[in-house]
Design a protein with these regions (language model features):
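Extracytoplasmic copper-binding redox domains, predominantly the cupredoxin/blue-copper superfamily
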Residues: 2-13, 18-104
Length: 104
């Protein structure tokens, strides 16, 4: 009985130590908007912007941690590394805004 308890405790510890798989959160740039404009992610996830527009755009963090140029019909990405509330915009079209909520 004691061995069974030790084995179960060891398995629980290993399961708790395995991190969840990182996800990719996609934002499409189209018609001078970010779609969706608000997304949620976890630390370690990747945010991918896909420019489906015929114009160049950017995804520029208002805190100046990143500034990504997005050519027409191309994509760019950033991996979020800490819990945060991130507001971003397109520096070519400042009315284009988005928000990323990053949780642990």
């Amino acid at each position: 009985m004691r061995l069974q308890t030790l084995v179960l405790a060891a398995l629980a510890a290993v399961a708790a130590a395995v991190p969840a798989a990182a996800a990719t959160v996609r934002v499409t740039v189209t018609k001078l908007t970010f779609e969706p404009a608000q997304v949620s992610a976890h630390v370690g996830d990747t945010i991918e912007w896909v420019n489906a527009d015929f114009l160049a755009h950017s995804a520029t963090d208002r805190k100046k941690e990143w500034d990504l140029f997005i050519a027409p019909n191309k994509s760019v990405h950033v991996t979020v590394t800490k819990p945060d509330e991130i507001d971003y915009y397109c520096r070519f079209h400042p009315n284009m805004v988005g928000h990323i909520s990053v949780t642990p």
